Amino acid sequence: MTTISAALPSGRLLEDSKAFLKKIGINVKEPAKRELISYENGYAFYFPRAFDVPVYVENGVDIGICGSDVVLERNNEVYIPLELPFGKCRMSIILPENREISFQNMEGYKIATKYPEITKNFFSEKGLKVKILKLNGAVELAAKTGIADAIVDIVDTGNTIKANNLKEAYKIMDISAVLLVNRITQKTKFDFINDLINKAKNYKNGVKGH
């Protein structure tokens, strides 16, 4: 039996990814302590950081799951057959709660973010030049300490930004978990991939129907 390799994101999407795969007949085995790979019923499961999932899939891992934000930021060569019915959130421009300004007037702003490419492209498309500060986490701190004029980050409930006296000012895009497929796997394991996509679509449509 051919082994199928799958990269699943460690972090907030992992449990939903496992639940989704179980619904379409793929049981994910948790890795042993300190292990990064597990094996179950012809599958090899890898558990990289979400930001690295597209890199693994582009470079030989058969399938993966991560957020659409990660795919857009990394811009790897992967096949994305469909959005998945979880991981729903949005990416937004976030400001101190007492600041009133339109994004059209943010020329020259310092923007802190974990998503420099998406941020740069958004402001470039609006014809605005901004300075981007690439951070790896807790970007709210950059706005609170004043090293950035605004931040671009993921918003789910909005509780974190409210707790830090910030506000969601402008939505840049909606985000969802997505299924990734290696470009070569798409051709060499066509029957498996086609079956997987059909099962995923059927499950997604069933979720929408409820």
Swiss-Prot record:
Keywords: Amino-acid biosynthesis, ATP-binding, Cytoplasm, Glycosyltransferase, Histidine biosynthesis, Nucleotide-binding, Transferase. It catalyses: 1-(5-phospho-beta-D-ribosyl)-ATP + diphosphate = 5-phospho-alpha-D-ribose 1-diphosphate + ATP. It is found in: Cytoplasm. Its EC number is 2.4.2.17. One of its GO terms (biological process) is L-histidine biosynthetic process. CDD domains: PBP2_HisGs (cd13595). It comes from the Bacteria. GO terms for cellular component: cytoplasm. Coiled coil: none annotated. SUPFAM superfamilies: Periplasmic binding protein-like II. Belongs to the ATP phosphoribosyltransferase family. Short subfamily. Catalyzes the condensation of ATP and 5-phosphoribose 1-diphosphate to form N'-(5'-phosphoribosyl)-ATP (PR-ATP). Has a crucial role in the pathway because the rate of histidine biosynthesis seems to be controlled primarily by regulation of HisG enzymatic activity. Lacks the C-terminal regulatory region which is replaced by HisZ. This is ATP phosphoribosyltransferase. It comes from Petrotoga mobilis (strain DSM 10674 / SJ95). The lineage of its organism: Bacteria, Thermotogati, Thermotogota, Thermotogae, Petrotogales.
